[in-house]
Amino acid sequence: MPDDQQPNDQHMVDMLGIVLTGDDSGAPVDNSIIAARLGWNLETVASCLNEAKERSLVWGQRSGDKPAPWFKELEITVQGRRLLRSHSANA
């Protein structure tokens, strides 16, 4: 995702896919793992996670790491799973 772009549903789906993989495998992810897997910078991940959290798509333990918000042990919520299902149904 370009640095100057606001997260959209496709960005959320991309990010949620990474969170879901970690959630399902029992190896929760954090900001740095998402950044590495998607090729995004940490500021972009933080921005996307902030919106995902506001939309109740993810849950995670917030830490003091920067750039904020930084989450450890991210999990996908029911709402996040619904977004993934609706996006895959529309694809």
Where are these regions (language model features)?
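Short alpha-helical segments that sit at the start of domains
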Residues: 1-16
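Short amphipathic alpha-helical interaction segments
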Residues: 6, 39-54, 71
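Short intrinsically disordered terminal tails
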Residues: 1-4, 38, 86-91
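A short, conserved structural fragment
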Residues: 53-64
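Short, amphipathic alpha-helical interaction segments positioned at domain boundaries
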Residues: 74-91
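Minor-groove-contacting beta-hairpin "wing" of winged helix-turn-helix DNA-binding domains
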Residues: 65-75
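Short amphipathic alpha-helical elements of helix-turn-helix/winged-helix folds
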Residues: 15-22, 83
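Short acidic, hydrophobic short linear motifs in intrinsically disordered regions
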Residues: 25-37
